[in-house]
Amino acid sequence: MKRLVILSACLAISLADWAQGNRNDSLRMDSIIHSLPDVMVKGNRPIVKVKGAALTYDLPQLIKNHPVDNAYEAIKQLPGVSEQDEALTLNAQSVTVMIDGKATTMTSEQLYSLLKTIPTSRIANAEVIYSAPARYQVKGQVINLLLKHNTGFHSLQGELFGGYTHQNRNSYTERASLLFTNKKWEIDMLYSFGHGKRYYYYENEFAHTLTDGTSYAFSTHSDNIKRHLNHSIRLGINYHLAKNHQLSFAYTSQLNNTRGTSEDDGDFTSLLRIHAKSQFHNFRLDYSTPFGFSAGAEYTYYNSPDEQWLKSSLYDEIYDITSQQRIDKWHAYLKQEHDLGKDWGLNYGINYTTSRDKSSQENNNKSSDGNTIQNEDQMSFYVGASKSFGQKLTMEASLMEEYYHTPIWNEWNLFPTLSITYLPKAGHVIQFDLDCDRDYPTYWSVKNFTTYNVGGYGKIVGNPTLKPSRDLSLSLTYILHSRYVSSLFFNNSKDEFRQLPYQSDKKKEMEYKHVNFDHVNQVGLMLTAPINIGNWWQNRLTFTGVYQNDKNSHFYDLPFDRSKWFCQAQWNGTFLFGKHVLLNLDASVHTDAIQGIIDIPASGYLNAALTWKPLKDDKFQLKAYCNDIFETGDNHLHDTYRGQHVINKMYFDRIKGLSLTYRYGGYKAKQHEEVDTSRFGK
């Protein structure tokens, strides 16, 4: 799932996000302000190496003096990486995360949940690829997280983690991991349990005028509580037949149960109750050989029933809606890589994915009852080549032909990629990347179903005519002394689809729907510099400037062509008090931004974390933290474009928390006789 987004720490939740819980059919406006990476380097130690199109970062070194508890938080420390709407972006664009070089059919949300269960002690390093060659089996930007593999050692080690968070209500996280290795086998097990409550408050203001001149003006304030129980499980087994000859199996499961209530008061009253469940199971089998051939298969099962009950005085009506989505998805691949000598490489392969989506909805007012079954097939063939010209210049290019078939779309598309890397001298890297891609809507967003929020005034509707987007990305990255990173980028997305509100001119209702833009264009520059003062104060300064143009010539009766310059500045400071205590401060401020007809006001935040590591080997860690200390990072939406009037102000308390991490176990002597061998939602 690839979305063109701008830099953002701004819009994490919108009105309809509450109405649908964790559903993607809720109003989740794409975030606007890019929250930039935390890059911290001690002294002049290199943190990045170049291999072909990949920049390999010493991620354990980057997170050494940061209050990072899991792989997801660790990835956010990479240059150019940010988090928006609980998703990762790289240089203002969405990014695919892989584990040990293996693509997956899991959705981004499911993969992020898995990353949050992986302890940082398992991380070896991370590869950043701005234009992934086709041999990676994914398109666009890629972060490849590489884990530690210790086959050849007898080892038993693990980690226990407990976390407490308070944001007006309490939430808890418990996590356990275990890794066992011997001569041939590697077995890792992860389990995480999250539970608790979340509270937030928002204010709404609406002014609505119909074509007959009738006007309405009303405002509400809302109290919202969510309760969640989330289980995440992973079992991974690697069997090494010989050097670089491996058979691996992985099972991942996520079970989520959410209940919530939302009470509106003001010019009208309403009560919304939601109960959403989901279960996800993923099975994967991979086989790799020492002569460059690899194959694999994967099956994913996803089932998500939910219920919504809404009673409102606005229309004196009760809405009782039951929805369900089941997805079965299969994926298989074959690929081959050759070393042709004289620094030439050749690769080619085939991928096939098929899925079956069965969705249904029952509505007491019969407005959107229905059952749908949609089959989707996707097959791609690719060929790629790489060449090194001496020690300073490398180039890699690939071409993928993809066939995509649904009941609506039946298309062939070509996707070229190109990456050129030049090393003028030690510690200096210049890299140019070109990437073409196509982004497809989620299953649920194209269903002709309806749900409600804001006392029934807001309707979240599907769009069966939604088209895939066509994306082009160019970037030029310069790394100085293996520490200072700058990136100039251009992103163009034709038929980009985003969800926007619209106040009808025919009746008193507001509609939220994914619509296709003509285009979304971005030109931006990111600069990141670590600055150390002695051995006790480490800093990182980041600045990003972006010009964005959003155009939609067919958005109801409100066509728009809007442009905006905006920027963000961020400072991250780490103060070292001896060898065992460190204090982290993270401050950010951004200017006004836009998204379609939405205006996003300026805001900022200050976070602090105090970490105590009493043992030399960091086996024990205690962390206390407070995010958004001054409560200035609240999310607000303003839509006053050409007669529309929607003001949403969402308020959150500062987040306070404690976490405890304990690592146990270690390595035993290596066996010298053996060779040391080593990756949906609605």
Question: What do these predicted ranges mean?
Answer:
Residues 438-487, 492-494, 512-523, 532, ...:
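Outer-membrane beta-barrel signature, preferentially recognizing the C-terminal barrel domain
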Residues 21-63, 83-85, 92, 140:
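Short, acidic, small-residue-rich periplasmic hinge/interaction motif at the N-terminus
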Residues 20-22, 614-682:
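C-terminal beta-signal and adjacent terminal beta-strands/loops
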